[in-house]
């Protein structure tokens, strides 16, 4: 499904068109009979003029959905077309010209019609899910759509702005599970990135928000994934696996579920399954960014060449990947490369923290040990040994 084009004449409304697209992708993904490409890959075509035949070939899909969104005060117009990729033929097209309050119904109708056209019928789960209205407040819905796009940037300032929007959404509708889930994600990102002076407080707030989201809606895959990663970092391995299993049963096309299951498998020492799960995430999201998780899986399996290749891909995206790259080089005997990667990591991480007025940790080894919950001590020692050999203490 391609990103719907924002036809509102206001670039600031891009987040709304993107959010509508993402919600429909999520709805379609929950049907096992459909193979649905994830948001990360489909959004790489945003703003580009590309033939559907080329998109179908690059992503390995038979059908493409495209459309547009025009938001006008209290009204909204959405167009959608289902196209056969190989031929370019339109299988279905519709225009929805409604009151803005009908946005959830429109998303449901697009999802149901696409599934009915391709599969011939709707499953019970799809019907139940499609009829669920996430919130009674359109303003809260708008806040969540905006916050979601800010969180995707994974920058400290955007995370703080997203938190404010999500708090506003929750104030308008305290039972809006999705808002609580994304608030948990925002605090999690703050903790994981080291963007807070009091790390434990951010982690605890993330846990509280996720727990609230699960109580409000335990059938949301994103909520389950969020709870799973929090349980994993608390070393609650059985609980983490239960949440990841549930997430994938609710949405088998969710690449984040496969990615986090890969990370869970890495942490418990099941490297074979970790690699298999990250490959599944890449299958559903071929243009996504999974080098970091793939690198950790290969490092833990002592496959250093594969790990180095993976971490080199994310070198410019995730500065902590440089520390892992340094450990990989150190364990494979490339001490010069290890020291260079370690030095680059320290320089970039220290600058980033200084820009945020956050002091660097007294021990980088302790920093990584806290954030990577290995179940077996030999795997943890293996990571810390690699960091030490690279010069990170």
Regions found by a protein language model. Name each.
Residues 29, 56-57, 312-315, 346, ...:
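Alpha-helix boundary recognition
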Residues 292, 321-323, 365-369:
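Short beta-alpha connecting loops at secondary-structure transitions
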Residues 2-310, 321, 328-332:
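Acidic, proline/glycine-rich low-complexity intrinsically disordered segments
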């Amino acid at each position: 499904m391609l990103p719907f084009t924002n036809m509102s004449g206001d670039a600031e409304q891009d987040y709304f068109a993107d959010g509508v697209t993402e919600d429909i992708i999520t709805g379609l993904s929950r049907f096992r009979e459909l193979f649905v490409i994830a948001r990360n890959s489909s959004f790489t075509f945003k703003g580009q003029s590309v033939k559907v035949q080329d998109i179908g070939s690059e992503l390995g899909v038979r059908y493409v959905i495209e459309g547009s969104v025009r938001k006008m005060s209290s009204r909204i117009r959405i167009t959608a077309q289902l196209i056969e990729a190989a031929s370019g033929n339109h299988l279905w097209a519709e225009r929805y010209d409604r009151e803005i309050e009908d946005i959830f119904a429109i998303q449901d109708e697009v999802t149901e019609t696409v599934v009915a056209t391709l599969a011939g019928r709707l499953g019970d789960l799809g019907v139940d899910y499609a009829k669920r209205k996430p919130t009674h407040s359109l303003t809260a819905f708008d806040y969540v759509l905006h916050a979601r796009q800010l969180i995707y940037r994974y920058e400290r300032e955007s995370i703080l702005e997203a938190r404010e929007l999500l708090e506003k959404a929750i104030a308008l509708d305290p039972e809006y599970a999705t808002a609580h889930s994304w608030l948990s994600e925002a605090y999690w990102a703050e903790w994981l990135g080291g963007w807070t002076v009091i790390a434990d407080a951010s982690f605890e707030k993330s846990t509280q928000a996720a727990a609230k989201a699960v109580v409000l809606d335990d059938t949301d895959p994103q909520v389950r994934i969020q709870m799973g990663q929090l349980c994993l970092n608390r070393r609650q391995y059985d609980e983490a696996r239960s949440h990841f299993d549930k997430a994938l049963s609710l949405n088998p096309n969710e690449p984040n579920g496969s990615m986090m299951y890969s990370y869970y498998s890495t942490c418990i020492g099941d490297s074979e399954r970790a690699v298999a799960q990250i490959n599944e995430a890449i299958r559903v999201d071929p243009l996504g960014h999974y080098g970091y998780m793939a690198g950790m899986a290969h490092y833990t399996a002592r496959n250093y060449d594969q790990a180095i290749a993976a971490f080199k891909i994310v070198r410019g995206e995730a500065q902590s990947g440089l520390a892992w790259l340094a450990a990989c080089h150190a364990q494979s005997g490339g001490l010069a490369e290890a020291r260079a990667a370690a030095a680059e990591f320290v320089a970039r991480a220290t600058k980033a923290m200084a820009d945020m007025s956050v002091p660097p940790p007294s021990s980088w080894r302790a920093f990584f040990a806290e954030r990577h919950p290995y179940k077996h001590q030999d795997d943890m020692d293996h990571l810390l040994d690699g960091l030490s050999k690279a010069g990170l203490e």
